[in-house]
Amino acid sequence: MFFLINKLVMNFDAPSPWGIYFQDSATPQMEGLNELHDNIMYYLVVILFAVGWILLSIVINYVSTKSPISHKYLNHGTLIELIWTITPAVILILIAFPSFKLLYLMDEVSDPSMSVLAEGHQWYWSYQYPDFLDSNDQFIEFDSYIVPESDLDEGGLRMLEVDNRVVLPELTHVRFIITAGDVIHSFAAPALGIKCDAYPGRLNQVSVFINREGVFYGQCSEICGILHSSMPIVIESVSLEKFLIWLKEQ
């Protein structure tokens, strides 16, 4: 039982077979996306049952040609026309305002403590830490390739593990600068609420604030060629002390 619980907890930050919901949130923006999704689902469920009830009532009560009120209320009802015009408009407004607010907040890039440059290639990712230097006084940079299934360690995730992970400190404002070296790619990490297109010759940026330690998996989300599925993204969030140790090892 303990093994199963630990296995489930580990897989919450990665795609799982037959998954029907989001991965566990690890950033404020992903928590906001979860909340927005749940709120919209509430409206959709209410609409589904309301429309279903109305249709069923019409079929049962007004389909008969003997009904003296069917034409009066269904073909010439000003009140009902106002209701089915105003009600959807109000619902759309209730959905739109939280959506616009979240969209604006996700587009804002707070004053970052550090930046990471992510560059997509066919078919791997390159990363650079422009705020830190290695032992040769060069920017810390490395390439990240998928680990073949034959080389996976025990417990490794197929098509998701890489040879070099992006290591970030938790509780730190980080800016990802995203670009591409050949064709269009997309940098996506669902648990972090990140999805940003990578264009050759153009820099896009997205802010992330990881609020817990963990290993978070993502993939290129733009079809970029025959090995598009072989461009996983692995971001490891560690404590600041562990991050400083990792920097010294580079």
Swiss-Prot record:
Listed under GO cellular component are:
mitochondrial inner membrane
Positions annotated to bind Cu cation A1: H185, C220, C224, M231
**What are the required cofactors?**
Cu cation
Q: Does the keyword Cell division apply?
A: no
| Record EC number | 7.1.1.9
Where does the chain cross the membrane?
Answer: 40-60, 82-104
Q: Where do the annotations place Cu cation A2 binding?
A: C220, E222, C224, H228
Record topology, Mitochondrial intermembrane segments: 1-39, 105-250
Its membrane topology is listed as: Multi-pass membrane protein
- Tell me the enzyme class: translocase
Q: Name one Pfam family in it.
A: COX2
List localization entries: Mitochondrion inner membrane
What this chain does, per the entry, is described as: Component of the cytochrome c oxidase, the last enzyme in the mitochondrial electron transport chain which drives oxidative phosphorylation. The respiratory chain contains 3 multisubunit complexes succinate dehydrogenase (complex II, CII), ubiquinol-cytochrome c oxidoreductase (cytochrome b-c1 complex, complex III, CIII) and cytochrome c oxidase (complex IV, CIV), that cooperate to transfer electrons derived from NADH and succinate to molecular oxygen, creating an electrochemical gradient over the inner membrane that drives transmembrane transport and the ATP synthase.
Protein's UniProt name: Cytochrome c oxidase subunit 2
Its source organism is Podospora anserina (strain S / ATCC MYA-4624 / DSM 980 / FGSC 10383)
The organism's lineage?
Answer: Eukaryota, Fungi, Dikarya, Ascomycota, Pezizomycotina
What's the gene?
A: COII
